[in-house]
């Protein structure tokens, strides 16, 4: 599979406590099959962050890759928007 055909997702970093690993929550909206109401869905992914660049609250883009551990199947591509620290 070529790199441009791999899944890419955009989500928010909810945890950066592990070394070289971030937890990203990806939120999507889908229509209910019967009632048609828009429902929010969310799913958490663990992603590889080689240089520990992403911090909690950042909006990041992750890409599917080969299995890096028992739970990691994605890697950090870029930080789309950095979190505002107050």
Curated annotation (Swiss-Prot):
Q: Which CDD domains match?
A: Ribosomal_uS17
Say if the entry is tagged with keyword rRNA-binding: yes
Instruction: Name one cellular component (GO) term.
Output: cytosolic small ribosomal subunit
What keywords appear on the UniProt entry?
Ribonucleoprotein, Ribosomal protein, RNA-binding, rRNA-binding
- What GO annotations for molecular function exist for this entry? rRNA binding; structural constituent of ribosome
What are the recorded Gene Ontology BP terms?
translation
Family label: Belongs to the universal ribosomal protein uS17 family.
The protein's job, in short, is:
One of the primary rRNA binding proteins, it binds specifically to the 5'-end of 16S ribosomal RNA.
Q: How does it assemble?
A: Part of the 30S ribosomal subunit.
The protein's name is Small ribosomal subunit protein uS17
| High-level lineage | Bacteria, Bacillati, Bacillota, Bacilli, Lactobacillales
């Amino acid at each position: 599979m070529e790199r441009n055909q791999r899944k890419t997702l955009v989500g928010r970093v909810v945890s950066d406590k592990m070394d070289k690993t971030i937890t990203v929550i990806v939120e999507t909206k889908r229509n209910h099959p019967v009632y048609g109401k828009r429902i929010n869905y969310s799913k958490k992914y663990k992603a590889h962050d080689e240089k520990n660049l992403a911090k909690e609250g950042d909006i990041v883009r992750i890409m599917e890759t080969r299995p890096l551990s028992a739970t990691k199947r994605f890697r950090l591509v870029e930080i789309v928007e950095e979190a505002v620290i107050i």
